[in-house]
């Protein structure tokens, strides 16, 4: 029952339950975030948040044409997406989304926007790294086996991300390694 409150912007006060249980149930671990969305490493699936209520997003109901669609891969990463009230239609039971054309278009449009901006968001996450090596460590922690964004590894392979060092040199990061063919001597 506590899971219902996990993504509320302000959690209610709970009585009759241990503080550690509440903390554990409401724990959100934001790995990366963009405008109106974030990846939560504790999420078992992706959710559309509308009016503090988390609605699971079904990739099946979005009718992706193929398994390798980047938007489908994004949903496998536990992405939490905020929507204004009324942008998505909900079922009569108010427990799930209705996958009408309007709701599907809103979801697909937002997913495309996130995928399009993902390289910039990820490059921003690496911007505070002092060295190439620090950036490589973070990159591998996120995208390597067991990393919180492992589901996005195929998306990253397609769109690519880069790290710019303090001297302005841009390092292209691909397939869990850096493009060292161009900069090998500078490592």
PLM regions and their residue ranges:
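Short, highly charged C-terminal tails/helix-capping segments
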Residues: 125-139
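Flexible helix-coil linker/hinge segments at domain or subdomain boundaries
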Residues: 112-126
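GHKL/Histidine-kinase-like ATPase module
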Residues: 2-109, 115-116, 137-186
């Amino acid at each position: 029952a506590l899971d219902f409150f996990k993504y509320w912007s302000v959690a209610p006060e709970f009585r009759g339950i241990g503080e550690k249980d509440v903390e554990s149930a409401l724990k959100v671990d934001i790995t990366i975030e963009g405008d109106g969305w974030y990846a939560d490493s504790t999420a078992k699936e992706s959710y559309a948040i509308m009016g503090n209520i988390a609605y699971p997003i079904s990739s099946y109901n979005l009718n992706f044409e193929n398994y390798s669609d980047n938007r489908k891969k994004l949903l496998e990463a536990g992405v939490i997406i905020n929507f204004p009230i009324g942008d998505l239609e909900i079922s009569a039971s108010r427990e799930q989304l209705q996958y009408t054309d309007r709701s599907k278009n809103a979801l697909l449009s937002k997913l495309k926007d996130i995928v399009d901006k993902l390289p910039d968001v990820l490059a921003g996450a690496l911007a505070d790294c002092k060295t190439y090596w620090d950036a490589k460590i973070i990159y591998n922690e996120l995208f390597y086996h067991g990393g919180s964004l492992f589901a996005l590894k195929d998306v990253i392979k397609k769109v690519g991300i880069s790290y710019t060092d303090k001297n302005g040199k841009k390092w292209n990061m691909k397939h869990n390694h850096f493009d060292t063919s161009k900069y090998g001597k500078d490592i």
